[in-house]
Amino acid sequence: MSKKIYSVITGTGSYLPTKLVRNQDFLTNTFLESNGEPIKRPNEEIISKFQQITGIDERRYIEDEYVNSDIAFFAGEKALASAGIDREALDYIIVAHNFGDVKHGSTRVDIVPALASRVKYKLGILNPFTVAYDVPFGCPGWLQALIQADYYIRSGDARNILVIGSETLSRVSDPHDRDSMIYSDGAGAVVVSAVESEEPVGILTHVTRTDTAEQVFLLQMGQSFNPEKGDDLYLKMNGRKLYEYALKTVPTAIKTAIDKSGIPITD
């Protein structure tokens, strides 16, 4: 049996911010409806219902002195150490994010230069053929970046790729929007390497979909529910609709991927 090239995760790394924010920390927030009117329920009730639905009772926020590319770098450094490879041997660095570097106290998005280029710089990589680029792809961005890495490796174009997913949603969340409790910050990274094998190993199949007919604006940028915040833009979502969408589509996508792999679901 002839050998084929497969993509295998050979190293992992992550960064978990140290700033811990518990649900009770939102008790003093002034939560508003989208029309700017106060929500006519006590914060205790709002928070209790949120925890009941999501199971979330705490989250991490990035430290004031860092930005997104910093924590992406921290995770990437750990992944390279875990893989034990020469960083100059990387063919690609792919960073999945949506808002770039947003400084503490600001909502201004900074995506030039690309976060992947900033990470490459912070890693001290001098190889000009280590191609660095970003993937802005919403919540599943890291998975889509991993899929792209898999294509590069299977084609023979690359041998080692650093894939990072990093986000600092706390910097673009509206404190007057109850949905802000679901957002948090952090970074994760993997090194994906080419492995020749007679048997399938590593990444076997994938499924991706983009639904826009009714869902395109379930996540969007919008002004604060507090008119006094002015024209600054914050991440807004239709939480209930997104929840219903996930329940409907994610299991189907998982089942399709399993079927494509040929692996029985019982395994």
Set out the residue ranges of the language-model regions:
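Phosphate/pyrophosphate-binding loops at sites that engage ATP/ADP/AMP, CoA/4′-phosphopantetheine
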Residues: 75-91, 253-267
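Buried hydrophobic packing segments
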Residues: 72-79, 145-152, 254
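Conserved catalytic cysteine-centered active-site region
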Residues: 43-69, 102-160
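Acidic, glycine-rich active-site loops and adjacent beta-strand->loop/helix elements
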Residues: 96-102, 136-141, 165-170, 209-210
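Conserved beta-strand elements of the Class I
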Residues: 8-10, 91-94, 162
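Flexible, glycine-rich active-site loops centered on histidine and acidic residues
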Residues: 156-186
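Condensing-enzyme catalytic core mediating Claisen C-C bond formation in acyl metabolism
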Residues: 1-65, 176-248, 252-256
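Secondary-structure boundary elements
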Residues: 84-86, 126, 151-160, 193-200, ...
